[in-house]
């Protein structure tokens, strides 16, 4: 489910109003793939990337890989795309797999592209750039455990009071 709909007015005048066409989802999803070992994959969509608690919840419930299929614009993509994905990888200690639309669309919109695969340490392992192509890399799930042991932010998180 895409939980957060993209209803924004960007500084360049672009307006996106997904709520006019779509309804939001209400459930965070983790799929389990049965292989030699179980692999847990958290699923998010596009604008969800801007809500770190969703990613932390997925990781807290066992996600080792989180997918983020997206269509970032040429306005937000160059300054936000890599940064947000790397931050979510680092915060959660998960691999991030982010397929992204690229190029010009019939409706006149342009998408930034840059399908990415990012390690739990925040390293970009594969980047498609603006190309229409297939990217891949070897994912060693042992890296998830290593990253989470090195920086145990998921276990260190504390609830706190506010004075506002």
Residue ranges and their predicted role:
Residues 34-36, 120-122, 140-142:
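Short loop segments at secondary-structure junctions
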Residues 14, 41, 131, 143-146:
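Short, functionally important structural connectors and interaction interfaces within domains
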Residues 49-135:
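CN hydrolase (nitrilase-like) catalytic-core segments centered on the catalytic cysteine
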Residues 30-32, 117, 136-138:
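Short, well-ordered beta-strand micro-motif
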Residues 142-164:
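A short C-terminal boundary segment appended to hydrolase-like catalytic domains
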Residues 1, 6-7, 12, 16-17, ...:
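Aromatic-residue detector
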Residues 1-4, 134, 141:
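Short secondary-structure boundary motifs at beta->alpha junctions and helix caps
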Residues 1-61, 74-83, 150-153:
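Active-site catalytic loop in hydrolytic enzyme cores
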């Amino acid at each position: 489910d895409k939980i957060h709909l993209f209803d924004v007015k960007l500084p360049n005048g672009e307006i996106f109003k997904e709520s006019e066409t779509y309804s939001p989802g209400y459930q965070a999803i983790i799929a389990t793939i049965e292989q030699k070992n179980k692999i847990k994959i958290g699923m998010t969509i596009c604008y969800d990337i801007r809500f770190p608690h969703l990613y932390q919840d997925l990781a807290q419930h066992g996600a080792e890989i989180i997918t983020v299929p997206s269509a970032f614009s040429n306005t937000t993509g160059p300054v936000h795309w890599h940064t947000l994905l790397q931050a979510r990888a680092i915060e959660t200690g998960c691999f991030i797999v982010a397929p992204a639309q690229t190029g010009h669309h019939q409706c006149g919109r342009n998408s930034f592209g840059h399908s990415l695969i990012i390690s739990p340490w925040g390293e970009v392992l594969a980047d498609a750039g603006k190309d229409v192509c297939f990217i891949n890399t070897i994912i060693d799930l042992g890296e998830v455990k290593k990253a989470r042991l090195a920086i145990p932010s998921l276990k260190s998180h504390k609830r706190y009071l506010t004075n506002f």
